[in-house]
Amino acid sequence: MCTRFVYRGSNIITGFNFDIDLSVWTHKVMKEKERFYIGILRPDGAYHSYHGVNQNGNVGTLLYVHGNSAGAYQGGGNCMTIADLTEQFIKAQISFDEVLQIVKSKKIVYAPDATMQAMLSDVHGRTLVIEPGIGYREEQSKYSLITNYSLIKPESTRDFIVPGDDRYERALQLLDNCKNEFSVSDAFTLLHTVRQEGAWATRVSFVSSVNERTVYYTENNHFEHIIKFTFPFA
């Protein structure tokens, strides 16, 4: 259960709460010269970057969603998994414009073992929501927000909303009340407001600032202890 947003003001600010069950997934924060990401251990033994930030401003995140049969995994050259698409974007192997061409020309499907939707954004704040089996939407408004339910076809996941899960509504209210001066501090206030506890607790929260070329993050809801990671200039 995760929360992701992009705010397009005088600075492009993105925020993400990574909420997982530690009995299901193994993760660790990875900091490299060109990437900051939450590494997810996969069966191939590698920590994959399905949630992260590239120094070029690309930010990609996957969020769990109740799956639909139209998005079920398929092989073949005309299909691409949402996991591969997101990781390639975070690695800057493909650009935002190339992602747009891919979602227009290929069928985007779930990975074989997980049903996820994605939000991808670039250094200019251009934002794309991708929902396998449903479609995609490029967003132009002041902000974008997604949790674990469909934005493009809300009725498809309405029956699967967890009772009491109002993260989207609470985050939406905070974003609605903000102006152009939306800051890193404001972003962490939002993430703190919608943090999760229990088995699916928030394990990592990060905020990226385009103007600063910096990612700020904290682990395990320790919002009093924010760590700063700045990408080096080439």
Predicted regions mapped to residue ranges:
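Phosphate-interacting basic helix/loop segments used at nucleotide- and nucleic-acid interfaces
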Residues: 101-113
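C-terminal, well-structured catalytic/ligand-binding subdomain of enzymes
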Residues: 1-91, 116, 121-234
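Short N-terminal edge-element motif at the start of the domain
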Residues: 88-92, 98-101
